[in-house]
């Protein structure tokens, strides 16, 4: 088999509709757009969300909530991700970025308790869940809030 002998799978290449090319084609004259009206015109049609003048859904529903501009966003990491470090390592947010465990530190790192930790580590982070603290200390490690 050579490159010029390759054929696309049956039905993979579909010919585009050629509209406005005579009545015999079935898509002549009005080109599948029906008779007159807004939708038959070039650039015709209504914007997304327009309901024909009826009060649209996005305006019938009440506004809710707000975005707290002072909210802190933490990079969350589960315990099982910390098993990549050697015993006795001091795990800091900078080290986590360096080892590509986390992409960005944001407002700090929060350690969550999903999974198990087999290594004895000293973990420094902004926040810890209760289960994460228990598991780190049970493995013989230390927890430091920074």
Curated annotation (Swiss-Prot):
Any single GO BP term: translation
Biased composition (Gly residues): 21-35, 42-52
Region Disordered: start-end pairs: 1-56
Family annotation (SUPFAM superfamilies): Ribosomal proteins L15p and L18e (SSF52080)
UniProt keywords, alphabetically: Ribonucleoprotein, Ribosomal protein, RNA-binding, rRNA-binding
GO molecular function, one term: structural constituent of ribosome
Record-linked Pfam families: Ribosomal_L27A
PROSITE patterns per record: RIBOSOMAL_L15 (PS00475)
Cellular component annotations (GO), alphabetically ordered: cytosolic large ribosomal subunit
Function text: Binds to the 23S rRNA.
Family: Belongs to the universal ribosomal protein uL15 family.
Subunit structure: Part of the 50S ribosomal subunit.
Protein name per its UniProtKB record: Large ribosomal subunit protein uL15
Organism: Clostridium botulinum (strain Hall / ATCC 3502 / NCTC 13319 / Type A)
Annotated gene: rplO
């Amino acid at each position: 088999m050579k490159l010029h002998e390759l054929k696309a799978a049956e039905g993979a290449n579909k010919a585009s509709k050629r509209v406005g090319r005579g009545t015999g084609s079935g898509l002549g004259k009005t080109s599948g757009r029906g008779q007159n009206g807004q939708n038959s015109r070039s650039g015709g049609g209504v914007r997304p969300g327009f309901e024909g003048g009826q009060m649209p859904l996005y305006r019938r529903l009440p506004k809710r909530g707000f975005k707290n501009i002072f909210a802190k966003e933490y990079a969350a990491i589960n315990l099982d991700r910390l098993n990549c470090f050697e015993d006795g390592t001091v795990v800091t947010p900078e080290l986590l970025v360096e080892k590509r465990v986390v992409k960005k530190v944001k407002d700090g790192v929060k350690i969550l308790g999903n999974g198990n930790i087999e290594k004895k580590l000293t973990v420094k982070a902004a926040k810890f869940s209760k289960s994460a603290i228990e598991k780190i200390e049970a493995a013989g490690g230390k927890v430091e809030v920074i």
